[in-house]
Amino acid sequence: MDEKEIQRLVEEVSLQYFGMPFLHKVKFNSRLRTTGGRYLLKSHNVELNYRYYEMYGKEELIGIIKHELCHYHLHITGRGYKHRDRDFRELLKKVDAPRFCKRMINEEKEKKIYKYECMECLLQYVRRRQINTKRYVCGKCKGKLKPISKTS
């Protein structure tokens, strides 16, 4: 789905469920990580998370669009557009929009663990980040560190 298709879909959903046109722009924002979408108050544009479309499909995306359009239409008409406002919650129920989107299934990255050992006192260090062994030394005896293993 590209920018033109998503723009057309949002305009259709707006007319179908709200009876009002969507007059601004919608786009996918690849930087969104934990949210399905967001409504921008200053520009009145809507940004959507493409990964929700990839993961859950068009139906979930339409739910997110309806949620963001609730913010949009309430803000445009000067009514309560925030999550805590009664107008917002009533409009969500009316158009059957989700209050929250599904949780993203994180493909957990393998956490790397680096092990270092002091060459003098044999103290072992376990770290999640790499250490520059030319710059850092053992905190106990000031001896040189050598990498032992890197586990993923």
Swiss-Prot record:
Example GO CC term: the record gives: cytoplasm
First-listed, main subcellular location of the protein, grouped into a coarse class: cytoplasm
Active site (catalytic residues): E68
Q: Does the keyword Iron-sulfur apply?
A: no
| Cell compartments where the protein resides | Cytoplasm
GO-annotated molecular function: zinc ion binding
Q: Which GO terms describe its biological process?
A: response to stress
Q: Which domain of life is it from?
A: Bacteria
Please give the cofactor(s) recorded in the UniProt entry for this protein. Zn(2+)
InterPro entries cross-referenced by the UniProt entry: SprT-like_domain, SprT_Zn_ribbon, Uncharacterised_SprT-like
- Protein residues bound to Zn(2+): H67, H71
| Keywords recorded for this protein, A-Z | Cytoplasm, Metal-binding, Zinc
Chain ranges of the SprT-like domain: 7-147
> One Pfam family of this protein, by short name?
SprT-like
How is the co-factor bound, per the entry?
Binds 1 zinc ion.
Q: Which family does it belong to?
A: Belongs to the SprT family.
State the protein's name.
Protein SprT-like
Q: Which organism is it from?
A: Bacillus cereus (strain G9842)
